[in-house]
């Protein structure tokens, strides 16, 4: 068995601005990541299998189970990432070399419902970005949060469906 670990602390934002990666706060280098995570792999695998078996053991139609599992894979892809502050951010999708459509677009991410149920604390970081960083003083919420977070309310216009969806998620 062999493992490949990495450490790329200098993640770029939606532009050329460097915003960093959350994991670089947790592990100073790839070696430390390996030392810490490799011993946890059996437990993580067991938790994953327990979750999958619980879902597959339900009475939901097969097509629903398949759709749920396929869509959950997005959460472990390059579509999402965490800033050093711990805030979860997301692209609308990914291409070969970079993400597609930046800014955790509110009227796209409103349709993603797995994170609040499976990773509630991560979902709260997305709400924090939407309401405390991407909302302008006049109450309009940018539908794409700029990075760094200090710039999140600059630029893009609001989208009614995005802002209303964010309000519903808080409710």
What positions do the PLM features span?
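Substrate-binding groove/exosite segments of carbohydrate-active enzymes
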Residues: 25-171
């Amino acid at each position: 068995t062999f493992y490949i670990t990495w450490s790329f602390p200098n993640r770029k934002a939606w532009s050329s601005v460097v915003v960093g990666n959350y994991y670089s706060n947790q592990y100073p280098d790839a070696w430390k990541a390996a030392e810490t995570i490799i011993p946890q792999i059996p437990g993580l695998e067991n938790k994953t299998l327990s979750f999958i078996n619980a879902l597959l053991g339900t009475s939901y139609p097969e097509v629903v189970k398949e759709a749920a599992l396929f869509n959950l894979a997005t959460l472990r892809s390059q579509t999402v990432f965490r800033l050093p502050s711990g805030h979860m951010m997301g692209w609308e999708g990914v291409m070969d070399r970079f993400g597609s459509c930046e800014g955790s677009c509110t009227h796209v991410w409103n349709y993603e419902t797995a994170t609040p149920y499976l990773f509630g604390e991560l979902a709260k970081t997305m709400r924090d970005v939407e309401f405390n960083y991407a909302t302008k003083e006049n109450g309009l919420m940018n539908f794409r949060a700029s990075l760094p977070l200090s710039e999140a309310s600059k630029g893009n216009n609001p989208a009614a469906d995005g802002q209303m969806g964010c309000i519903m998620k808080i409710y």
